[in-house]
Amino acid sequence: MTAESTRKASIERSTKETSIAVSVDLDGVGKFDITTGVGFFDHMLEQLSRHSLIDMRVMAKGDLHIDDHHTVEDTGIALGQAVAKALGERRGIVRYASLDLAMDDTLTGAAVDVSGRAFLVWNVNFTTAKIGTFDTELVREFFQAFAMNAGITLHINNHYGANNHHIAESTFKAVARVLRAALETDPRQKDAIPSTKGSLKG
């Protein structure tokens, strides 16, 4: 993580179901150290870090003998909380971003407003219940938890795609790229809060 950055935060979250430690640097270079015990999910979080340029450390232990649900959802909660904490008052950020991201057969769009208001719009359909052993419905569960706890409005729309792995991965990459753009410091407004209300606390 960069020595100059002040937009860093760490969160530790423990329940009877999971124990999770997350650290982020919003002004990083996309370095990651991620272990959740869920291989496909680790791969997706690595994409989120690498393409957002947010340095991430995620260590999660959960009740995987039951299923992956609690680990994935609670990681989304902790990661969202860490991003919100690192943002602070959200001064000087670009705030908005949107794009369409292509991945082979798949095209997925993402749009974000780092507004302090939590909302998820999800228009993504998978044609299989699992990718390997990973439940595809957990992709939405992660982004729901992340958006609610980061305090962001997030829209994700898969336009088309035949390969379910590509559909899932394109959602993480698309979200990563809009986060990269929206969380950047805007040199034209520096420490100003990008809102006529004077606050981005929801």
From Swiss-Prot:
The keyword Ribosomal protein does not apply. InterPro entries: IGPD_sf, ImidazoleglycerolP_deHydtase, ImidazoleglycerP_deHydtase_CS, Ribosomal_Su5_D2-typ_SF. PROSITE patterns: IGP_DEHYDRATASE_1, IGP_DEHYDRATASE_2. GO terms for biological process: L-histidine biosynthetic process. It is found in: Cytoplasm. Belongs to the imidazoleglycerol-phosphate dehydratase family. This is Imidazoleglycerol-phosphate dehydratase. It comes from Brucella canis (strain ATCC 23365 / NCTC 10854 / RM-666). The gene is hisB.
